[in-house]
Curated annotation (Swiss-Prot):
One cellular-component annotation, GO: cytoplasm
InterPro entries assigned: Dimeric_a/b-barrel (IPR011008), L-rhamnose_mutarotase (IPR013448), Rham/fucose_mutarotase (IPR008000)
EC number from the UniProt entry: 5.1.3.32
Gene responsible for this protein: rhaM
UniProt-recorded name of the protein: L-rhamnose mutarotase
Function description: Involved in the anomeric conversion of L-rhamnose.
Residues that hold substrate according to the record: Y18, Y41, W76, W77
Record has Methyltransferase as a keyword: no
Pathway connected to this protein: Carbohydrate metabolism; L-rhamnose metabolism
Assigned keywords, A-Z: Carbohydrate metabolism, Cytoplasm, Isomerase, Rhamnose metabolism
Length: 107
C-alpha cells in the first residue's frame, strides 16, 4: 500500500456545493475508484486559500492511471468543473504533495 497526497483549488464560495456533491457521490464512481485500488480517500479544505488537500491510500498494483479513460470519471470531472480549477478538458488541476513526516515511520 502507498499513500499519496495532492492539492486542488476550489472556486471561492463553493465549499457547500462541493460537500453536497461528494455526499451524493455516484456509486459507479465509488466502484471505479475501488476497482482501481484506491482506499481511504480523504479531502480536506483550507478556507483561507480555497485549497483542497486530498490524501489516499492505494494498492501497489493500482490502476489509477486508467481512471481518466473511464466514462464515469470524465462525467464526474465535467460535473465538478464549474466549482473548481480544471484544465480545458475538465481534469482537475492537481499539484502533487511530497511527504515530509510520518509518525508511524519513527522507531
Amino acid at each position: 500500500m502507498e499513500t499519496i497526497a495532492f492539492r486542488m483549488v476550489l472556486n471561492p464560495g463553493m465549499r457547500e456545493e462541493y460537500e453536497r456533491r461528494h455526499a451524493q457521490i455516484w456509486p459507479e464512481l465509488v466502484d471505479a475508484l475501488h476497482n482501481a485500488g484506491v482506499r481511504d480517500y480523504r479531502i480536506f479544505f483550507d478556507p483561507d486559500s480555497h485549497h483542497l488537500f486530498a490524501m489516499l491510500t492505494r494498492h501497489n498494483h493500482h490502476t489509477m492511471n486508467e481512471l481518466p479513460q473511464l466514462d464515469v470519471m470524465r462525467k464526474w470531472w465535467d460535473y465538478m468543473a464549474d466549482i473548481m480549477q480544471t484544465a480545458a478538458d475538465h481534469t482537475p488541476l492537481q499539484q502533487p504533495l511530497e511527504p515530509v513526516f510520518h509518525l508511524n515511520s519513527l522507531s
